[in-house]
């Protein structure tokens, strides 16, 4: 056979001879039979076999077919009517209506037989709906459309096995099952049996109601889902319709103006209950309020006038904090001014370089001036317990004055420096008389002649009069646990340390033939982080503490610091010898320990403490002897 001539523009479908050549010659099997008309031959074979052996058969698209179905209904109609997708999409809603009303509603779904005739007595086959939706019979997303299947890799094999079983069971149309089997019962049970690891579907294409497919859900293992499937894959952000409540602050702090922190009422009450006795708050508040009233000119007395005059002197010595002070006015004009109280109110109208400090109290009422960070968001109140910078560590203190003005800062700074220099003098005969100290200091600074000069080796005039901004800062509020439990444990350790130090001192003095140490240990104080242990003592002569420090370091393995109390104020006789509250408290603890079999030594509660307030007593006595 000669093939017709073709070129690049020739189409096989347009050339009849070329098409016949491919149909009759090329499409043949090994036996030489043509393969071009296989569909037609198969139809003829089925017609002959059906006529010879009429029996039921299975169609994998339309379900079970009986022998009464004619062949024309199967193959004669090429445009077979099928149920629409929207009809199957409403199946869940129709079934819910029927379950609620107790009867079937007006059906809008029709099943079509092979001849295209709709019938209402046959329910739409659920497997058709699942095939269209590409899901399993129990609402499990198949691996083809489930983008989140990677989150449940352990259950994929189980889901595939369930799908295969459902497909095998779905070969027979449930609409033609035996009458004694309830289709509603079968399908209802299959629909309600959700697997434990099923993936949720969306409702009405609303992406904000449930978790999207691309995010794993922790609660999908416990919830059941029977809502219609959303064919649209959701990748939009999830809108939380029920946001969680704002977490409560376990530290008991309250937010002010959205950025500042302050102690709540409950936390502040806890501060007052735990810190009042330990930090001698009553005596400290009384002393500071008295000084503030004197500096304002509220008190009219000789001592108050001397305090105000000395305050003006301190201002003149700190021009960097007070550029518009009276130092810019001539001495004659300054002396011709009004009374001291009025001059104190009007002399400092502006302090350009001064930033308010914070006045705090340590154990037994020892005062400290601190600075606040420039970016601090803490709103402090009197009585708050805060964590501050300590000596190479952290410490816990009581807030006395949240905002200290320049007048109070200058006066408190002078008192602290005076106490420091006095504590370094071991021989009481070397102290300069306190009743003459202020006048001598002022005259020496102004260049006037004095009867007795201050010893520059014992007193540094510049350091006495100059206010230096402290480097230690307020860090944060103390937590409830730090204010109660940790502070109580700290006090209990301090009682034991006081007892051990006195035992060590007694042992060293007994073994020393030269007389030993002539000191009296008044108190012990741990830094809050236990990195430093300070012992406060008083003595009348110079002593060598190296052996005592070695013994204490062997026991505590921390830095040991011995701090002297000025011996020219009779602090031990006025605030310690007649009371010794802490020493008696420790003796009482040990007596209960000897009678108790539990082996636990517990100090009294913080709100029941009564301590030796000798630290604030030092400030009170110093003001009295200097300006009284």
UniProtKB/Swiss-Prot annotation:
Keyword GTP-binding: no
Residue list for modification Phosphoserine: 31, 34, 84
Swiss-Prot/TrEMBL keywords: Acetylation, Cytoplasm, Phosphoprotein
Record's protein name: Uncharacterized protein YLR177W
PTM sites of type Phosphothreonine: 235
Domain PSP1 C-terminal positions: 472-565
A Pfam family of this chain: PSP1
Modified residues (N-acetylmethionine): 1
Stretches that traverse the bilayer: none
GO molecular function: mRNA binding
Misc: Present with 1550 molecules/cell in log phase SD medium.
Gene Ontology CC terms, in alphabetical order: cytoplasm
């Amino acid at each position: 056979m000669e093939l017709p001539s073709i070129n690049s523009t020739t189409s096989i479908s347009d050339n009849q001879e070329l098409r016949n050549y491919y149909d009759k010659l090329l499409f043949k099997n090994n036996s030489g039979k043509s393969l071009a008309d296989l569909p037609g031959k198969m139809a003829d074979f089925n017609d002959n076999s059906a006529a010879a052996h009429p029996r039921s058969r299975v169609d994998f698209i339309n379900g079970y077919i009986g022998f009464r179905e004619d062949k024309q209904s199967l193959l004669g109609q090429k445009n077979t009517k099928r149920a629409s997708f929207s009809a199957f999409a409403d199946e869940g809603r129709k079934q819910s209506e029927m379950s609620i009303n107790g009867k079937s509603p007006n059906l809008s779904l029709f099943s079509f037989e092979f001849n295209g005739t709709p019938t209402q007595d046959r329910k739409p086959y659920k497997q058709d709906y699942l095939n269209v939706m590409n899901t399993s019979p129990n609402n499990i997303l198949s691996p083809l459309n489930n983008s989140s299947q990677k989150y449940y890799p352990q259950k994929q094999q189980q889901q595939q096995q369930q799908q295969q079983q459902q497909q095998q069971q779905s070969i027979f149309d449930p609409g033609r099952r035996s009458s004694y089997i309830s289709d509603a019962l079968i399908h209802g049970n299959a629909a309600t049996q959700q697997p434990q690891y099923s993936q949720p579907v969306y409702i009405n294409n609303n992406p904000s109601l449930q978790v999207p497919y691309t995010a794993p859900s922790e609660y999908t293992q416990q919830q059941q889902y029977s809502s219609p499937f959303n064919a649209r894959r959701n990748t939009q952000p999830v809108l939380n319709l029920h946001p969680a409540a704002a977490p409560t602050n376990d530290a008991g702090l309250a937010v002010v103006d959205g950025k500042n922190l302050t102690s709540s009422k409950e936390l502040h009450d806890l501060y007052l209950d735990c810190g009042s006795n330990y930090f001698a708050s009553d005596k400290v508040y009384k002393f500071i309020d008295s000084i503030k009233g004197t500096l304002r000119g509220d008190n009219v007395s000789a001592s108050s006038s001397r305090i105000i005059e000395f305050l003006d002197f301190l201002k003149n010595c700190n021009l960097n904090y007070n550029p518009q002070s009276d130092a810019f006015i001539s001495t004659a004009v300054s002396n011709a001014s009004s009374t001291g109280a009025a001059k104190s109110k009007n002399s400092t109208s502006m302090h350009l370089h001064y930033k308010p400090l914070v006045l705090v109290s340590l154990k037994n009422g020892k005062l400290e001036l601190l600075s606040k960070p420039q970016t601090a968001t803490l709103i402090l109140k009197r009585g708050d317990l805060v964590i501050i910078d300590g000596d190479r560590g952290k410490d816990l203190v009581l807030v006395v004055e949240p905002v200290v003005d320049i007048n109070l800062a200058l006066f408190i700074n002078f008192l602290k420096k005076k106490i420091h220099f006095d504590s370094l003098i071991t021989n009481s005969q070397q102290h300069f008389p306190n009743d003459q100290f202020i006048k001598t200091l002022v005259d020496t600074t102004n260049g006037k002649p004095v009867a007795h000069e201050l010893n520059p080796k014992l007193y540094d005039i510049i350091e006495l009069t100059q206010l230096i901004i402290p480097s230690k800062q307020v860090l944060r509020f103390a937590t409830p646990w730090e204010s109660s439990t940790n502070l109580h444990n700290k006090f209990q350790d301090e009682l034991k340390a006081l007892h051990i130090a006195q035992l060590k001192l007694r042992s060293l003095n007994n073994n020393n033939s030269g007389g030993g140490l002539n000191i009296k240990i008044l108190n012990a104080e741990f830094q809050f982080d236990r990195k430093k242990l300070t012992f406060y003592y008083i003595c009348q002569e110079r002593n060598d503490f190296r052996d005592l420090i070695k013994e204490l370091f062997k026991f505590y393995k921390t830095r040991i610091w011995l701090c002297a109390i000025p011996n020219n104020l009779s602090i031990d006789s006025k605030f310690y010898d007649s009371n010794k509250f802490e020493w008696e408290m420790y003796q009482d603890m040990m007596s209960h320990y000897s009678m108790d079999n539990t082996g636990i030594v517990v100090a009294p509660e913080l709100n029941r403490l009564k301590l030796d307030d000798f630290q604030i007593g030092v400030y009170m006595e110093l003001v009295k002897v200097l300006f009284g």
